[in-house]
Amino acid sequence: MEAAADGPAETQSPVEKDSPAKTQSPAQDTSIMSRNNADTGRVLALPEHKKKRKGNLPAESVKILRDWMYKHRFKAYPSEEEKQMLSEKTNLSLLRISNWFINARRRILPDMLQQRRNDPIIGHKTGKDAHATHLQSTEASVPAKSGPVVQTMYKACPCGPCQRARCQERSNQIRSRPLARSSPE
C-alpha cells in the first residue's frame, strides 16, 4: 500500500523535480533570468551608462525660439528651411527644434494669444462698441446697430429662389416689430 502512495512521486524524473519552473514562483523565475542577463550585460549597470536626466535648453536658444514663435504666433509652424535657420542660430538639432515647437504650441502659444486679447491697447473692444464694430466689419451695406442683422438672414437662407421671397417677407415682419425692453419703466 505504501508503494501506491509513493507511485506518482516516483514517476517524475529527478530533473523535473528540481527544475526552477516546478519549485519557484514566476516572480522568482524572472529574477533568475534577470540575474543571468545582468552577468552578460554588466556594462548597462554602470552609473556612466544610465539614461541621462532631461535638461532644459539653453536660455539664449529658448529666447530665439520664443521670439520666432511670437512673430509667427498666428501660424506657429516653421517650414523646414526655417527650422534649419533656427537650428543654426540656436545650435540645436532639427529634432529638438521640432519637439520644442510641438510642446510650445501646447504650452506657450495659448498664453501668448490670451495675453494679446487681454492687452488694453491691442486687445478687442468690449461691450456695445465691440458689437457695433463687429457688425460693421461683417456687413458693409448694413449700418451698425446693436441688434441682430436681419437683412442677412435671407441671404444665407438655404431655401431655393422660390422661397427666398418668403424669407425676406419674414425678415421685414421681424424688423417692423417694436423691440421688447427687459426692464419696465
Curated annotation (Swiss-Prot):
GO terms for cellular component: chromatin; nucleus. Residues 1-58, 166-185 are annotated as: Disordered. Residues 21-39 have a biased composition (Polar residues). Keywords: DNA-binding, Homeobox, Nucleus, Transcription, Transcription regulation. It comes from the Eukaryota. Specifically expressed in adult testis. It holds the Pfam family Homeobox_KN. One of its GO terms (biological process) is negative regulation of transcription by RNA polymerase II. It is found in: Nucleus. Residues 48-111 bind DNA. The keyword Transcription regulation applies. One of its GO terms (molecular function) is DNA-binding transcription factor activity, RNA polymerase II-specific. May have a transcription role in testis. May act as a competitor/regulator of TGIF2LX. Belongs to the TALE/TGIF homeobox family. This is Homeobox protein TGIF2LY. It comes from Homo sapiens (Human).
